[in-house]
């Protein structure tokens, strides 16, 4: 059971980091240069990871935007 707990914790941490990277890209325009990765398998994995962050950022923004507890400034 501790293994699954640790695995879940690492998964959530990775998702949060990916979402933060997406937010940084959206707010400042700074992004990770995937083209500098030479290994195609690693490049594909990094692209999927960053795309997940974009999706999570979009979903979070849509959810918070529809809530009455938050307002756009």
From Swiss-Prot:
Keywords: Autophagy, Mitochondrion. Disruption phenotype: Impairs mitophagy. Does not affect reticulophagy, pexophagy, nor the Cvt pathway that delivers the precursor form of the hydrolase aminopeptidase I to the vacuole. One of its GO terms (cellular component) is cytosol. It comes from the Eukaryota. One of its GO terms (biological process) is mitochondrial fission. It is found in: Mitochondrion intermembrane space. Its main location: mitochondrion. It holds the Pfam family Mitofissin. InterPro entries: Mitofissin. One of its GO terms (molecular function) is lipid binding. PANTHER family: CHROMOSOME 16, WHOLE GENOME SHOTGUN SEQUENCE, DUF1748-DOMAIN-CONTAINING PROTEIN. Homooligomer. Found as homooctamer in solution, but binds to membranes either as a monomer, dimer, or tetramer, not as an octamer. Mitochondrial fission factor that acts directly on lipid membranes to drive mitochondrial fission required for mitophagy. Directly binds to lipid membranes and brings about lipid membrane fragility to facilitate membrane fission and engulfment of mitochondria by the phagophore. Belongs to the ?ATG44? family. This is Mitofissin. The lineage of its organism: Eukaryota, Fungi, Dikarya, Ascomycota, Taphrinomycotina.
